[in-house]
């Protein structure tokens, strides 16, 4: 299903009067499972992230991940909570290809999207102009982390899962507040 259709379906479920909605685990530790989660807890997670990152009404945010998983759903919930201007792209390995000159305040990507984006000069420039980038959904290898350290914007690695309604930890990857992690 194209992402715009997924988005409309998610918004319909979000605005439904039920205090719950269904999400699907990624299956990274076994068979993917469906589970019901409370919308108010999703809003609380969105509030914590938006407040911590200083996101506010009108900031441009990028949705470039599938809405069948919690990461994509939480980008929408953060946008609803904070009044972000959500830009929607079909999930792909190159989310900033043919993007144009619209600067982004906030984006969330998986490591492969970041890796691919950094390989294409025009896409790399757009990524470096994105004020805040969070990277989740998988480990960031040492070579990619080293490349990210050189980026001028604010980049975090996230740790979380469906059961925690997105990330529960952020680790700064670059800038003076960067936190090194050795394996």
PLM features per residue range, with description:
Residues 1-13, 122, 133:
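ANL superfamily adenylate-forming
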Residues 1-5, 33-36, 85-91:
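Short beta-strand->loop structural element characteristic of the AMP-binding/adenylate-forming
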Residues 6-24, 57-60:
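Conserved pre-ATP/AMP-binding loop-to-beta segment of ANL
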Residues 20-47, 54:
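Conserved AMP-binding A3 loop
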Residues 25, 182-183:
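Conserved small/polar residues in nucleotide/adenosyl-binding loops
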Residues 25-28, 61, 76, 107, ...:
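Conserved S/T- and glycine-rich ATP-binding loop of Class I adenylate-forming
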Residues 39-44, 60-116:
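AMP-binding/adenylate-forming
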Residues 120-175:
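Gly/Ser/Thr-rich phosphate-binding loop
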């Amino acid at each position: 299903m194209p992402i715009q259709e997924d988005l409309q379906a998610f918004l319909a479920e979000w605005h439904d009067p039920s205090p719950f909605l269904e999400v699907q685990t990624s299956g990274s530790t076994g068979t993917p499972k469906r589970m019901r989660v409370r919308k108010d807890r999703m809003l609380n997670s969105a509030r914590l992230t938006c407040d911590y990152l200083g996101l506010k009404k009108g900031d441009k945010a990028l949705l470039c991940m599938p809405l069948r998983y919690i990461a994509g759903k939480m980008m929408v919930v953060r946008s609803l909570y904070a009044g972000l201007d959500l830009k929607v792209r079909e999930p792909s390995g190159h989310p900033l290809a043919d993007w144009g000159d619209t600067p982004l305040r906030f984006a969330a990507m998986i490591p492969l999207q970041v890796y691919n984006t950094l390989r294409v000069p025009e896409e790399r420039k757009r990524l470096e102009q994105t004020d805040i980038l969070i990277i989740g959904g998988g480990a960031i290898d040492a070579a990619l982390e080293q490349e990210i350290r050189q980026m001028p914007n604010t980049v975090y690695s996230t740790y979380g899962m469906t059961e925690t309604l997105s990330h529960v930890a952020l680790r700064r990857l670059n800038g003076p507040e960067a936190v090194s992690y050795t394996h």
